């Protein structure tokens, strides 16, 4: 197991903990569809990171690593933006 996965797990745990404490502090609740969109975006982002790292490190395919990584990261941003927009619209009311 590479060290990148250890540090990625630590960063993910710290980031999610900070996000949940910020939600509690600002009294923000999420609906079920916002949870689904957030988890989908997070999984796509993790897939992009893992694919880019594995393709570049083990297969030495830098071009395909970056092309697929960028495409999947762009796809990961879409559900996260929809969830953030939905929460912002509800909180502003």
From Swiss-Prot:
Chief location category: membrane
Similarity comment: Belongs to the PceB family.
Induction: Cotranscribed with vcrA and vcrC.
Membrane topology: Multi-pass membrane protein
Keyword Transit peptide recorded: no
Localization of this protein: Cell membrane
Annotated transmembrane regions: 3-23, 35-55, 64-84
Function noted in UniProt: May act as a membrane anchor for the chloroethene reductive dehalogenase VcrA.
The protein's name in its UniProt record: Probable chloroethene reductive dehalogenase membrane anchor protein
Naturally occurring in which organism (per UniProt): Dehalococcoides mccartyi (strain VS)
GO cellular component: plasma membrane
Keyword line: Cell membrane, Membrane, Transmembrane, Transmembrane helix
